[in-house]
Amino acid sequence: MSNLIPAVIRSKAEASAASLWVIHYFTACGFLELFPWVGSGYDMERFGILAVATPRHADVFIVAGYVTQKAVRRIQRIYDQMPSPKYVMALGSCPMTGGMYWDSYATVKRIDKYIPVDLWVLGCPPKPENIGHGIVMAMNAIKGGFGGH
């Protein structure tokens, strides 16, 4: 009986990693690089990833593109509406440093000051292959027991 509980926990983590539901917030070119994952190029549903319309059903929150001071409130509200465990991916240079809008008074330079970020995907914009690598890394981390937030 004592071996059953770790086996159930492991199998729950594997099932969670194999069926990620995603909500996104995109404002710039990072979104364009995600198109191959939505279409037949990489077909995210083949990996068990499904885009959902409401944060209440989402496991993963993807933020791409520049974030303004006004938009950060929306991002925080989306994050707060997600059930636990929840995971956050930031795509591209804009959520990390403000990107090419770094010198604007209205641009948020680091999104991780407002919501916790679990995975950063580098690039301006990030290539679809890098996004895929990040998704696989996230799946492996969840399988390995990473509990998110």
PLM segments and residue spans:
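Functionally constrained cores in energy, signaling, and assembly domains
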Residues: 6, 12, 24-30, 74, ...
